């Protein structure tokens, strides 16, 4: 290893690691230290195989970094290793997926015979020096093409032997050496970019780019690409590879002051039901909850597995360059990079290989909810000089997007015998986009003819956002959806009939839930809007809220709510529950996850009870024994398979109050003592932390609700009259909500106005 020059030995070292191989390398200060480390790493790797098709990188283990591995890219980073002797440098290999791209080396040339440009196919005209010729590949080009930097680039394999010529710079921006050459705009050569072909009349001899035969005729002899100038026969258009090269500003120019563009750019709103970044319990509080003394150990209040309220993803489904135009303006042919993501089609102006799209250059966003239909075009071209488009996207705004170009029409239809060059090509972008958009507009269901009519009826009314999962229940999954005619966001519960048992208990529960929702009408209960049934699925459409009570609890710094917010939410729950009980309905699965909130950004939102999958019609003085609900919120009589009535909901209310004020569950199921014994042990049920900060009246209400004896359990009427749920501040909070909602009073009464004074 060459260490000539001024060096200073630190007496330290680093460890190069490649797989299971480790080697200690002395750390010295030298201008070429990074190159020396890379060379030694290359020698280690070459002992296991060749590096011809792979790139090598060094990463330092940085445990304080979120990524754990920190790339080593500059010599200045080497000096910091002296502060951390013995650090490990990981050798990472990455396969090369790119072809070596090098520029032509051209010089002016005089031709004695007719010669055509190898780029555009037109005849090189003139007496002397008609064009330029590459010394390496002997290809000929127009002089004007030479000035288009990044276009005259070839993929040469194998590489020429005369590297001296290749090392000479051809253009100002392409001066890198052979394998390091990568002009930014030449990256587009590696992207499948379609040509924008239009009929053209040629005044000079021109050959076809595909077959090298002359374009014959007096007028409109062939097709010319609007962007790169390539010329082809009509019959050869289908065989032209999608390798168009765009010059500067070749993609449609966009005026971002246009209201249409502003609307598209401003639609990147945060989707509903997305968890905020701070919905986590801080580590110090979580640690305090988990490390309590064993005698008062509680379960930390968190969402059970499989009950996450929001599963919003930003999954990219399909992308690629597409040619399109609006039916009302067929002359304006546009070329954009289409990407399906977030339940919308994004049309980007810029795309670079390895970098991706430029998010600041969005031409338009087409939400799936605005698409009414996707229709294949089998007719003639809108304009005779352009090929027919492949399919149409029709929207609720009466805008029709014509997508793709059908080159088969120029040759009189698809060829009977597919050329060998075409047989290995994948399905065209237009075909994939047509099928994908058509499938995306359908609700999640089986693809069979029996379901087609019912699924089409539902798809015409609602667009299900299948990548925005709101939650899951015992029989189905809840998705976000858009009502097409109004744009209103709703929640759709997709129920799979396959989950129903053969005995029919599942179907009975589902029908009971729908029947209950159809009979209820209360501001505190989620509203049923629509129901549709296919052979294997049932779609239940309900109004959508912006979160649930559990999310609100977990979003707090201490993982619990204060008394004022708890009382505000509790009165709304009790009023809705009283309405259900008056209708003879027991919810049977009351818990924070099933209490939806109108606004996660407010401390005093409206609440609505949802998920009536376990709800039962229980008349007065009758009991049931069927299994219902979530065990953590159920009273002993249900867990012990004894008879229960509507008072089981009051037990659930007591558990909700407990977990809301403390952040933990009231009972430890792992203890050998029974629930009744745990209730009698006040020090176990209400430890000093955090119950010393809670009013004694709240503890009194919880104790009266968590009674093992059904008869001793507080009724809903007495609960609403309890002293903890009275007070001027609570009255004003509830009355303010009623005024904001502009609904008839359902939380307060005129007697409260007399007692506390009217709201000012």
From Swiss-Prot:
GO terms for biological process: intracellular signal transduction; phospholipase C-activating G protein-coupled receptor signaling pathway. Its EC number is 2.7.11.13. The keyword Membrane applies. Keywords: ATP-binding, Cytoplasm, Kinase, Magnesium, Membrane, Metal-binding, Nucleotide-binding, Phosphoprotein, Repeat, Serine/threonine-protein kinase, Transferase, Ubl conjugation, Zinc, Zinc-finger. PANTHER family: PROTEIN KINASE C, MU (PTHR22968), SERINE_THREONINE-PROTEIN KINASE DKF-1 (PTHR22968:SF15). The keyword Zinc-finger applies. It is found in: Cytoplasm; Membrane. Prolonged phosphorylation at Thr-626 results in ubiquitination and degradation. This is Serine/threonine-protein kinase dkf-1. GO terms for cellular component: cytosol; membrane. The gene is dkf-1. The lineage of its organism: Eukaryota, Metazoa, Ecdysozoa, Nematoda, Chromadorea. It comes from Caenorhabditis briggsae. The modification Phosphothreonine is found at residue 626. The active site is at residue 589. A zinc finger (Phorbol-ester/DAG-type) spans 103-153, 194-244. Converts transient diacylglycerol (DAG) signals into prolonged physiological effects, independently of PKC. Role in the regulation of growth and neuromuscular control of movement. Involved in immune response to S.aureus bacterium by activating transcription factor hlh-30 downstream of phospholipase plc-1. Its cofactor is Mg(2+).
């Amino acid at each position: 290893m060459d260490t000539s020059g001024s060096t200073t030995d630190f007496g330290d070292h680093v460890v190069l690691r490649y797989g299971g191989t480790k080697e200690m390398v002395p750390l010295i200060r030298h201008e070429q230290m990074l190159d020396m480390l890379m060379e030694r790493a290359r020698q280690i790797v070459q002992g296991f195989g060749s590096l011809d098709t792979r790139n090598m990188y060094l990463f330092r283990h940085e445990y304080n970094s979120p990524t754990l591995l920190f790339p080593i890219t500059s010599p200045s980073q080497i000096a910091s290793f002296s502060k951390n002797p013995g650090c490990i440098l990981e050798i990472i290999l990455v396969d090369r997926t790119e072809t070596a791209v090098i520029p032509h080396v051209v010089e002016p040339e005089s031709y004695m015979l007719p010669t055509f440009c190898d780029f555009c196919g037109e005849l090189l005209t003139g007496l002397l020096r008609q064009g330029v010729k590459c010394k390496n590949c002997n290809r000929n080009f127009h002089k004007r093409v030479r000035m288009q930097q990044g276009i005259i680039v070839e993929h040469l394999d194998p590489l020429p032997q005369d590297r001296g010529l290749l090392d000479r710079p051809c253009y100002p921006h392409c001066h890198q050496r052979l394998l390091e050459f990568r002009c930014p705009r030449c990256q587009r050569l590696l992207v499948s970019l379609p040509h924008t072909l239009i009929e053209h009349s040629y005044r000079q001899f021109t050959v076809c780019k595909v077959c090298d035969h002359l374009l014959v005729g007096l007028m409109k002899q062939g097709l010319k690409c609007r962007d790169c100038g390539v010329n082809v026969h009509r019959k050869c258009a289908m065989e032209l590879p999608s390798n168009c090269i765009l010059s500067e500003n070749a993609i449609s120019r966009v005026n971002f002051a246009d209201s249409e563009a502003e609307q598209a750019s401003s639609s990147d709103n945060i989707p509903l039901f997305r968890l905020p970044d701070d919905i986590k319990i801080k580590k110090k509080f979580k640690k305090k909850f988990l490390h309590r003394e064993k005698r008062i150990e509680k379960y930390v209040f968190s969402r059970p597995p499989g009950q996450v309220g929001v599963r919003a993803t930003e999954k990219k489904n399909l992308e690629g360059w597409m040619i399109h135009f609006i039916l009302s303006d067929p002359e304006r042919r546009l070329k954009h990079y289409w990407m399906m993501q977030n339940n919308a089609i994004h049309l980007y102006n810029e795309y670079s290989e390895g970098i991706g799209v430029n998010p600041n250059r969005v031409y338009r966003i087409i939400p799936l909810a605005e698409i009414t239909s996707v229709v294949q075009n089998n007719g003639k071209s809108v304009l005779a000089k352009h090929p027919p488009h492949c399919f149409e996207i029709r929207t609720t705004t009466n805008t029709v997007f014509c997508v793709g170009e059908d080159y088969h029409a120029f040759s009189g239809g698809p060829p009977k015998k597919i050329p060998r060059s075409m047989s290995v090509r994948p399905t065209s972008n237009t075909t994939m986009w047509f099928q994908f958009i058509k499938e995306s507009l359908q609700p999640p269901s089986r693809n069979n003819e029996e379901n087609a009519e019912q699924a089409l009826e539902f798809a015409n009314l609602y667009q299900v956002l299948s990548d925005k999962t709101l939650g899951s229940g015992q029989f189905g999954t809840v998705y976000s959806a858009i009502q097409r005619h109004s744009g209103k966001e709703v929640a759709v519960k997709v129920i799979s009939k396959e989950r129903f048992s053969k005995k029919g208990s599942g179907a009975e529960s589902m029908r009971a839930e729908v029947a209950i929702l159809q009979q209820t009408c209360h501001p505190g209960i989620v509203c049923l809007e629509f129901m549709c049934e296919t052979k294997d699925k049932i779609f239940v459409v309900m109004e959508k809220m912006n979160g649930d009570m559990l999310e609100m609890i977990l979003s707090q710094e201490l993982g619990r709510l204060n008394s004022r917010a708890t009382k505000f939410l509790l009165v709304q729950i009790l009023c809705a529950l009283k309405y259900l009980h008056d209708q003879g309905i027991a919810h049977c699965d009351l818990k924070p996850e099933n209490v939806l909130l109108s606004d996660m950004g407010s401390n005093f939102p409206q609440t609505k009870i949802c998920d009536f999958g376990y709800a039962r019609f229980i008349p007065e003085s009758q009991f049931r024994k069927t299994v219902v609900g979530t065990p953590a919120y159920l009273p002993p009589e249900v867990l012990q398979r004894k008879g229960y009535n509507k008072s089981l909901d009051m037990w659930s209310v007591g558990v909700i109050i407990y977990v809301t004020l403390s952040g933990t569950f009231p009972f430890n199921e792992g203890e050998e003592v029974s629930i009744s014994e745990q209730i009698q042990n006040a020090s176990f049920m209400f430890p000093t932390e955090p119950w010393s900060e809670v009013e004694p009246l709240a503890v009194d209400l919880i104790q009266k609700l968590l009674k093992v004896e059904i008869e001793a359990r507080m009724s809903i009427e007495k609960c609403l009259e309890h002293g903890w749920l009275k007070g001027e501040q609570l009255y004003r909070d509830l009355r303010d909500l009623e005024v904001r909602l502009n609904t008839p009073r359902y939380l307060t009464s005129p007697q409260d106005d007399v007692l506390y004074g009217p709201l000012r």
